[in-house]
Amino acid sequence: MSNLIPPHGGKGLTICLLEGAELEEEKKKAQGLKQIPITPSERGDLIMIGTGGFSPLSGFMTKADWKSVCDNYLLADGTFWPIPVTLSASKEDADSISEGDEVALYDPEGDEIMATMKVTEKYEMTEENKRYQCEKTFMGEGTTNAEEFWKIAEDEHPGVQKVMNQKQFNLAGPVKVLSESDFPTAYKGIYLRPSESRKIFEDKGWSRIPAMQLRNPMHRSHEYLAKIAIEVSDGVFIHSLVGNLKPGDIPADVRVKCIDVLVKNYFVEDKVVQGGYPLDMRYAGPREALLHATFRQNYGCSHMIIGRDHAGVGDFYGMFEAQTIFDKIPYPEETGKALLCKPLKIDWTFYCHKCDGMASLKTCPHAKEDRVILSGTMLRKSLSEGTPIPDHFGRKEVLDILREYYEGLTDKVEVKLHGAATGDEKK
């Protein structure tokens, strides 16, 4: 009997990734099917469906699921789910498909068929529907109304841009996943399926496991958060996004090197498990924090570390909106349908000169002038511009790796600071 938190949905991990003879047979069949091209973001979602990371999803959402998730944070059957997971297709492709047809999902970037799909429904994503999804998914406390949101969203919000650039139709239906792309080889030893992370945790005898979401290299604030989590748990799961980020962010292979050297030199190694997952960032702030908790439950994590501006971008969200949303979502009475992974909420963290170390608003009594807010955005800006980085911003071993990466860039990366990066607490 496992001591781990059960997968989301109450039915165990929903695995749609084929193996062995079944895989080879489906690959042959896929060669004769109509091919639907998918985006890198859809590829990441597809792999998560395949491995059980998105349990209980077994395919891409119907219109009823899409609408219910947008409106109520619930699938049509009443299971909690925070963000639409959909597959787009051009009008030309959609017109050539009938409901009940099987299609092959083709990844142009990797030049391979990733999955087969039985199309149970196709529905139009009008401009109105796309805007509706964006307002429900991406609009936070940083803007007061839809009019204000749309004044800046299409220019400044990468998640909004992705949705608005999607093709005209969505295809829904169950999938049979044939490949995990190059993630298992490109991130060997880091990329983990939920079944693999669960086995690691079980072998260690862990049950209270907070997950730490990373899309930036670990600076001192990240280190502090992880160590706080370790103090109140069996160990921490440092789970890095190895899919695509927005332009100017630091690539996954560099971030993984930084985590490796930090864990080796500054952590008790058997209290840390490092993993990677294949999604692209959505930058959906509070809703994405809920998604992070949902799929971390599938990976075996009991808690999700939520700090300031989790999964945010620019000034679209309140600093701690990603924490308070956990108190506002529906919790279905049927336990398996409710989100069980709980937030580990952590206050503002910073380096304090008077404390001579990392601290938070709960532990440091000193003035704002004594504090240095540490953020990935500020770190990237300093590295890009070649300006000095104070020792308290990051460990030397980590900064050396980052400097080497930035020195090798041929084009200068412009990094824009925003409220969450500078410590502006007005939100």
Feature map (PLM): residue ranges:
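Active-site cores that bind ATP or allylic diphosphates and position pyrophosphate for catalysis
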Residues: 1-427
